[in-house]
Amino acid sequence: MGVLMSKRQTVEQVQKVSLAVSAFKDGLRDRPSIRRTGELPGSRRGTVEGSVQEVQEEKEAEAGTSVVQEESSAGRAAWERLRDGRGVEPEEFDRTGRFTPPAFIRPTRKLDDDKPPEICLEPREPVVNDEMCDVCEVWTAESLFPCRVCTRVFHDGCLRRMGYIQGDSAAEVMEMAHTETGWSCHYCDNINLLLTEEEMYSLTETFQRCKVIPDCSLTLEDFLRYRHQAAKRGDRDRALSEEQEEQAARQFAALDPEHRGYIEWSDFLSHESLLLLQQLRPQNSLLRLLTVKERERARATFLARGSGSTISEAECRRAQHSWFCKRFPEAPSCSVSISHVGPIADSSPASSSSKSQDKTLLPTEQESRFVDWPTFLQENVLYILAARPNSAAIHLKPPG
């Protein structure tokens, strides 16, 4: 009787075979080759002395290359993680009893990617989460953690075995996942995973030319230096103006909400991925990236802030800021602030105070101009995507 294999078991077996083949190829590549030309007269090859001499030559060759290999192995591993869409992997990560993360395949753009998607204001779309855990594909009566962006759900134990939550972070995930703020899964938390292979190659090439080291934090000086070098990539005579440099400094402050003086690599990578999407993708392609939950939150915001089928331009601008309103959980045990994925209720004190501040920032002429639903989506799509990560950083600061 044949043995039935699930899709996940098949993927894991393919991954194991691929890893074995890759390890074998790496071993052949790293093994030093000793080139022997002609045998000299009086050669000791084939004797005991000759064997000892060959072993000594191999040890000397290995010692000469070991230093170079150790120096480049860390950098090579970081670039490979960046290319494959994987995060930082601690050296002391205990993989005993862990699940093998599924192989990630970067998305590809379809032929009709730039055509306008059908995202109507009415009727509303039903939002239904998956019934089975995305990792083990098993339904249990235990509490499942829903993602605030997609419809995936996860078990606490599965997230631990995958290495996505460690230590006491499980309690914080449990608190956030069942609140209005919500929690983003490992797929939605990493905006870089939205890039295609070609877009990722372009971003990696920019990092290499600007000498950006992956998995390393950046200070304000590093961030501004990178901005200047990236601006000169296409035109050597081009440089950032004072206004652009001030804007970059404000963006750095938004990426460093705790005022530590540096920004994490994951926040920097998300910010640069958003800028690349803004540069290379048309608006219709960006709209196709929105999930059903994000589209529903956008509808709720438009209907709450607008009047009928239109909304004032001032309210549209305020909505761009509202995606990043910080909501601190009421539970004192959770000390992590998460970026809000939707606007705060209009009746809340935080909403009224933010509106009064926005009115001082926005011109009064915008109150008389109105935008429709498609325009509202186009002007907010990037900021909706930027609010996906769990980090408290603002990965794309709205103007104003």
From Swiss-Prot:
Residue ranges, compositional bias (Basic and acidic residues): 78-97
Modified residues (Phosphothreonine): T47
Entry GO MF terms: transcription corepressor activity; zinc ion binding
Residue positions, PTM Phosphoserine: S43, S51
One Pfam family in the UniProt entry: zf-RING_15
Modified residues (Omega-N-methylarginine): R36
Entry's Gene Ontology cellular component terms: cytoplasm; nucleus
Protein's UniProt keywords contain Transcription regulation: no
Chain segments annotated as coiled-coil in the UniProt record: none
Lipid-conjugated positions (N-myristoyl glycine): G2
InterPro entries with a match to the protein in the record: EF-hand-dom_pair (IPR011992), KIAA1045_Zf_RING (IPR031946), Zinc_finger_PHD-type_CS (IPR019786), Znf_FYVE_PHD (IPR011011), Znf_RING/FYVE/PHD (IPR013083)
Swiss-Prot/TrEMBL keywords: Lipoprotein, Metal-binding, Methylation, Myristate, Phosphoprotein, Zinc, Zinc-finger
Region (Disordered): 30-108
ZnF start-end (PHD-type): 129-190
PANTHER family: PHD FINGER PROTEIN 24 (PTHR46453:SF4), PROTEIN KINASE C-BINDING PROTEIN 1 (PTHR46453)
Name assigned to this protein: PHD finger protein 24
Protein encoded by which gene: PHF24
